[in-house]
């Protein structure tokens, strides 16, 4: 673990079933996470290739997915090992090479001490939460590969959230907060530390301001970690899938009801318009009067 303080890089020969691995993307701006299940295969959660954050802007292509579809896109032939497993999005399984997409391999650490956690200034590399056994982790990952992990969300339900859930079985209950992702928690803590208005009243020197800002950043990261959050609860994977399916069914029913209501409203509007047109026609062209008598 001491070596992991400087780098979480690991050789693929040292991987074990159930390991949470990741690889940095776009010059270390963000990382893509997954669960290693053995035989150089990885299960991970992704949005459609080229739509990682779904903003409809150039950022979608900048933050690319690590799905087999992304790796086999363009003129290059599909991967001989996992090309037949291609899915457009959701929970996917791919070989380790496609997952890494040319990047280096890193191991996410669990059950670290508070001192180690704070020493790793970059979020999304470790957590204070303890990991379950490798078999339990692999079971969750395979179950979600078959059943799905819900809708992808950069802030609530991303690839790191998926991997952390598989490792710990922990979910965040609070609706108005970021998910389990250490990357997003780190970013949120940084913005909060810089934007906190009391900073200018706590110190008058540049050095003091840096110390206060660093302190607030560390506190923000620590209280957001899944290992210390009070709103984190253990949820069996079968229960999670059942809840997700029920929510999706309810949303589909709501959308269908809204669509039906809109169709009925449009039909009534069309009928009213037809009646109004007919009334106008009678006004403009009154029936002819018989003057023969």
Model-assigned labels for residue ranges:
Residues 1-293:
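Cysteine-nucleophile amide-bond enzymes
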């Amino acid at each position: 673990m001491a070596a992991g303080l400087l780098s979480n890089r690991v050789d693929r020969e040292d991987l074990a079933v159930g390991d949470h691995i990741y690889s940095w993307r776009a010059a270390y701006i963000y990382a893509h996470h997954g669960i290693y299940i053995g035989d150089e295969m990885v299960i991970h959660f992704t949005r459609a290739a080229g739509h990682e954050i779904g903003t409809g802007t150039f950022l979608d292509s900048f933050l690319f997915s690590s799905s087999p579809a992304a790796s086999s896109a363009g003129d290059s032939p599909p991967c001989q090992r996992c090309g037949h497993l291609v899915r457009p999005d959701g929970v996917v399984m791919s070989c380790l090479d496609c997952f890494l997409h040319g990047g280096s391999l890193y191991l996410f650490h669990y059950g670290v001490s508070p001192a180690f956690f704070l020493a790793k200034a970059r979020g999304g590399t470790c957590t204070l939460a303890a990991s379950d056994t490798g078999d339990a982790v692999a079971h969750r990952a395979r179950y979600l590969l078959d059943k799905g992990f819900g809708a992808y969300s950069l802030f609530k339900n991303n690839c790191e959230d998926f991997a952390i859930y598989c490792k710990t079985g922990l979910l965040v209950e609070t609706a108005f907060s970021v998910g389990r992702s250490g990357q997003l928690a780190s970013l949120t803590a940084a913005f909060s530390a810089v934007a906190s208005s009391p900073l200018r009243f706590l110190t008058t020197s540049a050095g003091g301001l840096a110390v206060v800002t660093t302190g607030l950043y560390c506190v923000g990261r620590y209280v957001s970690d899944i290992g210390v959050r009070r709103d984190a609860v253990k949820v069996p994977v079968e229960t999670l899938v059942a809840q997700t399916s029920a929510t999706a069914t309810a949303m589909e029913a709501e959308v269908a009801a809204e669509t039906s209501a809109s169709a009925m409203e449009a039909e009534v509007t069309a009928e009213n318009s037809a009646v109004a047109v007919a009334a106008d026609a009678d006004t403009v062209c009154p029936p002819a009067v018989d003057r023969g008598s």
